[in-house]
């Protein structure tokens, strides 16, 4: 059986890690042990924050909706309750976008929610 020298495979593996560690600072970009650890940790952060991103955006939409309905004499929770009672099915992302880009349309939805609460 022929002897297998593993230099080519090792070099390819290291190259892959270095490519992922591109842009890192200090030894984390050019020492294989540090680069591997940094790339692993970066992967953990990426996985965790893909989940967290959904929560963060929902919180942002809620804050924007709340800021838009307060001048209309309502709070966020009262507004959402009014929407549910009036049968308006619009998600928070769309409501937030409407509040920013189409204030008149958002105000019409808010009036509908207010009317449903009064009834």
Curated annotation (Swiss-Prot):
Transmembrane segments: none annotated. It comes from the Bacteria. Keywords: Ribonucleoprotein, Ribosomal protein, RNA-binding, rRNA-binding. Pfam families: Ribosomal_L20. GO terms for biological process: ribosomal large subunit assembly; translation. InterPro entries: Ribosomal_bL20, RIBOSOMAL_L20_CS, Ribosomal_protein_bL20_C. GO terms for molecular function: rRNA binding; structural constituent of ribosome. One of its GO terms (cellular component) is ribosome. PANTHER family: 39S RIBOSOMAL PROTEIN L20. Binds directly to 23S ribosomal RNA and is necessary for the in vitro assembly process of the 50S ribosomal subunit. It is not involved in the protein synthesizing functions of that subunit. Belongs to the bacterial ribosomal protein bL20 family. This is Large ribosomal subunit protein bL20. It comes from Rhodopseudomonas palustris (strain BisB5).
